[in-house]
A protein has these predicted regions:
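The conserved 3'-phosphoadenosine-5'-phosphosulfate
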Residues: 49-57, 151-207
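Short glycine-/polar-rich loops that comprise or flank the Walker A/P-loop
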Residues: 97-102, 154-157
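Catalytic phosphate/metal-binding cores of nucleic-acid and nucleotide-processing enzymes, i.e., regions
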Residues: 76, 123-124
Length: 207
């Protein structure tokens, strides 16, 4: 009788879960990485308010509450363990230290990022208030500062992913990301997301 009872006891998964964060500068490939992880079977924290468009054919995968991190909006973290959420690099420093994070940090040539941002603004009939040279310097300083900060956070593991290499070699990077996360993911579906035809605004063209 007791053996039967114990044999049917539920198995409790005691594996510690991390909050998975996709980060980087805007237009660095964060939405594509979110799409990859979603296709790979990782639960995504998103509100789907902002739909896919010409600027982001893969969708935006945004979650409005994270935009209030600097204001102390942290309630969403209670439901974030084991899920992936997109957070721009400027907000990473506001993540509380009582959680553990796996950060996938997207890197892309700054000239490509600026060119992509300019095209997005142009489609919306808007103009940047800052010239590219100034913006590039600001981005470079920000990236140096955030990398310095990340390297000193005991509760954060980080992998840096180069956008252009991911586009041209998605299989290799999908495996690396899966190993970094340490959770079951469908690598084949992940690697099917990057599309070189969507690799616009290359560094050689963004002069």
């Amino acid at each position: 009788m007791l053996r039967k009872l114990f044999s049917h006891s539920p198995v409790v998964d005691k594996t510690p879960k991390n909050v998975i964060v996709v980060s980087g500068l805007p237009r660095s490939g964060t939405s594509m990485m979110m799409k990859m992880l979603a296709e790979g079977g990782v639960p995504v924290l998103t509100d789907e308010i902002r739909n896919a468009d010409e600027d982001n054919p893969n969708g935006y995968y945004e979650f409005e509450p994270v935009k209030q991190l600097a204001d102390g909006q942290l309630s969403w973290l209670a439901n974030a363990n084991g899920k992936v959420v997109k957070i721009i690099s400027a907000l990473l420093e506001y993540l509380p230290g009582d959680h553990h994070y796996k950060v996938i940090f997207m890197e892309r040539a700054i000239r490509e990022i600026l060119a992509s941002q300019q095209k997005m603004l142009s489609r919306r009939n808007e103009k940047s208030a800052t010239v590219d040279e100034v913006m590039q310097k600001q981005f470079e300083q920000h990236l140096a500062a955030i990398k310095f900060w990340l390297a000193r956070q005991p509760n954060i593991d980080v992998i840096f992913v180069e956008y252009n290499k991911l586009i041209t070699n998605p299989d290799e990077y999908s495996v690396k990301i899966a190993e970094f996360l340490g959770i079951p993911v469908n690598v084949e579906k992940m690697s099917s997301v990057p599309n070189e035809r969507l690799y616009r605004n290359r560094a050689g063209d963004a002069r």
